[in-house]
Amino acid sequence: MQWQGRSVRKPSGGRYHTSQGKKRTEIGRAPAETHIGEERRRIVRTFGGNQKVRALRLEYATVSNPATGETKKTKIEAVEANSADPNYVRRKLLTKGAIIKTEMGRARIVSRPSQDGVVNAVLLA
């Protein structure tokens, strides 16, 4: 568990004096960091008793072709680019906005694999 609330320190190094302590709504978790590989998912209990599917490894993506309106399940071959972090390409991490190479061609991921549990992508022209 990770606390994601505001720091108790000011930019000057002094302390903020708050009227409340840490709240349960401010906790978070470590990122799932979805890789290319044999499918592995983890179900996580979230706030309010709901569930979130975390994709740890995925090998298929649902790719849509905007020109023809066709959508197909295709195999992910490689991660070609990722504007979030250049190291994500080396580590083959799947994140929203990453450019992947599929059997249909190059595509941009539009879903959040570590939050949704699936990779949805749109084919690049």
UniProtKB/Swiss-Prot annotation:
Pfam families: Ribosomal_S8e (PF01201). Part of the 30S ribosomal subunit. Keywords: Ribonucleoprotein, Ribosomal protein. This is Small ribosomal subunit protein eS8. It comes from the Archaea. Gene3D superfamilies: 3.10.290.70. HAMAP family: Ribosomal_eS8. Coiled coil: none annotated. GO terms for cellular component: ribonucleoprotein complex; ribosome. GO terms for molecular function: structural constituent of ribosome. It comes from Methanoculleus marisnigri (strain ATCC 35101 / DSM 1498 / JR1). The keyword Ribonucleoprotein applies. Residues 1-35 are annotated as: Disordered. One of its GO terms (biological process) is translation. Belongs to the eukaryotic ribosomal protein eS8 family.
